[in-house]
Amino acid sequence: MSGLFLSKGLFPQEFFRPTVEFLLRAQQADGSIPWFDGGHCDPWDHVESAMGLSIGGEYGAAENAYRWLKNTQLEDGSWWAAYRAGEVDNRERRETNFVAYIATGIWHHYLITQNKTFLRE
């Protein structure tokens, strides 16, 4: 292999398009991306979905996904374990370990888009 697994242009966009289309259909108006229609959303898997949108060239949708995370982050820096239909779905625990993965997703988006304005947001 002569490049990173997901180096730009390594795979044709048609390869990813069905997944990207699924993510676009699943994404809610508030930017959250549940596991499936009517399912819950957890920040970890949500970031994976946002990364898929970035890879698929859907930068606006990916940025909306990251804005949802910004808007739902709790004062102590954590997130609830799960959300559903815009509400907290699991108040039994909060997750601080999501922070590193969310930062990774945002960095990934920046590496693809070079959008410094988004980083400053």
Set out the residue ranges of the language-model regions.
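Low-complexity, Ser/Thr/Pro/Gly-enriched N-terminal "stalk/linker" regions
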Residues: 1-44, 55-68, 72-79
